[in-house]
A protein has these predicted regions:
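C-terminal cap of thioredoxin/glutaredoxin-like
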Residues: 1, 63-142
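Structural alpha/beta surface segment adjacent to cysteine/selenocysteine redox centers
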Residues: 1-70, 138
């Protein structure tokens, strides 16, 4: 996204799907990471969850969330207190509702200038055989 620095605003919203049993708590944990360590901590935490999540339906173990927070440099007890308090659950629920209201029914879902793009797209497809974000964003910036 460095190509679009200063031109594109990149925003992420939580939309944990119910069939991923740990997704809602993982979303809360990511919000706790952001509260305690800012954007950098959010992205480190978020990216590590996705790197380590198994695709066999079990996801990322909930008991690994606090150690992961410590691993990325967050205060372990502050993170645990935030996560255990459930204070991020309303934020996650609100983001899910906003997504549903905007037509999101699954992930990934992306909006470019308010237009919903459902499903995964490559950033760039030099063959132009499929839609890609670069083409969509470049058109929106014209």
């Amino acid at each position: 996204m460095s190509t679009y620095k200063g031109k594109v605003r990149y925003v992420i919203r939580d939309f944990p799907l119910s069939f991923h049993q740990n997704a809602a708590k993982q979303a809360e944990a990511s919000e706790c990471a952001a509260e305690l360590g800012g954007n950098d901590a959010f992205w480190k935490f978020h990216d590590k969850i996705f790197e380590r999540t198994t695709s066999n339906g079990t996801g990322f173990a909930l008991d690994a969330l606090v150690p992961l927070a410590k691993e990325i440099g967050l205060n372990e007890s502050a993170f645990k207190n935030c996560l255990d308090s459930g204070k991020m659950a309303p934020r996650v629920a609100e983001q899910m509702q906003e997504g549903s209201d905007a037509g999101v029914s699954g992930t990934p879902a992306t909006f470019v200038n308010g237009k919903l793009i459902s499903g995964a797209l490559p950033f760039s497809d030099p063959t132009k055989k499929t839609a890609d974000f670069k083409t969509i964003i470049d058109a929106a910036l014209k």
